[in-house]
Amino acid sequence: PAVYDQRQTPRGVAYVNDAQGAYAQVEDGWYSGMFVGAVEWQPGIEYPGNEVASEKIVACYFAASIWGDTEGRTLDDQVTEPVTIAGLPGYRTTATVNFAKAPMEKTSATSLTVIVLDTPQGPSVFMLETAVGVAEHEEAAAEALESLTGVA
């Protein structure tokens, strides 16, 4: 989507390699983002499957040191469900990161969506991190999800 006009490699994302992301500024120092990448598990550890991978990526992202001056962070409303996209099986995990205290004026929460699919190249991920209440970003994220996955 046009509002996601900044490109960079995502940070704070465990188990993901070769990722490229697009970002939209919410306000100074805070962004909504989306990216695609390859899922790479820990060397010497058997890949646990797409369901566990999608859940672990969300959990590790929540625990990462990327949340700036926010306080009282909680991971709420987590749901994991099977999906099939373009004939490729996988799992989608959604959750909301709520902040008890945040320096931002436009949002106090972030919506997370992680989709891990089996692809011919191995497990792949599509992730959205969207500032809740920023309508332009929420609409663009929904549009991107629909265009890439056919899943609304």
What is the role of each PLM region?
Residues 1-51:
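Secretory pathway targeting signatures of secreted, lumenal, and periplasmic proteins
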Residues 85-152:
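Short, well-structured beta-strand
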Residues 46-54, 134-141:
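Solvent-exposed, acidic/flexible segments
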Residues 40, 44, 76, 124-131:
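A near-ubiquitous, low-amplitude feature marking generic local secondary-structure context
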Residues 31-39, 71, 119-122, 126:
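A generic structural signal for ordered alpha-helices
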Residues 2, 58-66, 146-150:
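Sec-exported extracytoplasmic/periplasmic mature domains
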Residues 26, 34-38, 54-62, 112-114, ...:
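Generic hydrophobic, helix-prone segments enriched in Leu/Val/Ile
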Residues 52-112:
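Signature of long, low-cysteine stretches enriched in small and polar/charged residues
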